[in-house]
Each structure stands twice: as structure tokens, then as C-alpha cells.
Amino acid sequence: MGGLGAAALVLGSNGLISQRGGYGELVADPGGVIDLPPKFKYRIISEEGSTLSSGAPVPGDHDGMAASRSRGGTTILVRNHELRPSDTVTGNAPVPQKTPYDPAAPGGTTAIVVDNVGRREIRDYVTSSGTLNYCASEATPWGTWLTCEEDRTTHHGYVFEVNPRDPQNNLSRTPIRGMGIFSHEAVDIDPRSGLAYLTLLP
């Protein structure tokens, strides 16, 4: 994407995958953003360099994302910003802070509320701040977002839980110490057992 982060909805037919495998060959995108199979299309709904609903810049270094149904015919897309202090020196906007875990850390998460019919952004906002290097994450069966710091410096290297429907609350700034402090790559919750599976960066 030419070094720019973007959040996009990929839209396709509701048919089953062909038993011959896959959805077909990728078709080159004239816009140079993403190549998709026939009958698929995308729409960029948010992009680094644009502005949040608050007027602050959309932070960069987008990483893990998840979408969940919400009220009033909308979907909430939560995204990580895998930022560290050196990124802000090179021009990346930090995540705006209200109740940060660490005021010196530029990372965090934002959420985008999308209209299901028009597939357009209604608003976007910060859901957590003051973290380092958020990598992959997990949408939980109970509707929150577990997000992982791929970092191991003083006071960092934790998993945090974010509620996109109650942004920047105390939960979002409280590390889940029971999941350890190390360079977390990802977390996944088994919906049947409730067990959490953690991966780490070697």
C-alpha cells in the first residue's frame, strides 16, 4: 500500500468456495491497492493521513484488526497501531491519549463504526492508548478485543482487553498480568473451552 496504512472492507459474493479450490485467479487492481478474485471489490474506509472524528490524525502502522456486529445496522472495526517511540520521530502520528497505560508510549487501538448498507464510516475514535507495538489480537466471544504488545521493555510486553463500546475505560489501561510479560505475537480464545492460547516472538 505504498507504505500507508488503510482499513478496507473486502466484499464478495455469498456463494460457497468452489470445490476446485479458492475463488479464482486474482485480478490486478488498477489502483494498485489490493488484487482480489473476480466479483470481489474493496472500499477504503479509513486511511493513515486522514483524520479521526475528533479531528486528530489517524495513527499509522495498522496491524491486527477485527470486525463485530453492533446496533443500528452497524459494524465496529477495531484496529491496532503497532507504534513505538522511534515511529513518531519519523512522522507517524501517535494514538491520541485520554487514559493511557503509559503516557510516554505512542501506540494503542482505534475503532471505526461502519454503516452496513452503505459500507461507509460513520465515526471513528480511540479505544486505548499508551502502549507499545500492538501486533495481532483476538476478538473475544464476549465482544471485547484482546490485543498484544510485541515488545519486552520495562513495564511493556502485556496483553490488554479493550471494549470498543466503552472506549478508553480502566479496563483498556490495565495489563492482564496473568497472561505473562513477554513479546506477545498473538492470542486466541477457544470459544468452547474459554482457554487462551498465546504465541510469542522468538
Sequence positions of predicted segments:
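Conserved beta-propeller blade signature
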Residues: I76-V78, W145-L146, G194-T199
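N-terminal export signals
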Residues: M1-S18
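N-terminal low-complexity or amphipathic/hydrophobic leaders
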Residues: I44-T88
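Well-ordered mid-protein domain cores that form the structural environment of catalytic cofactors
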Residues: L83-R173
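Blade-edge beta-strand/turn elements of extracellular beta-propeller
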Residues: D29-S50, G55-A56, V114-S128, F160-S183
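Beta-rich, blade/repeat-based domains predominating
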Residues: A56-S68, G130-W142, I181-G194
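Extended, regular secondary-structure scaffolds
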Residues: V159-E161, E185-A186, D190-P202
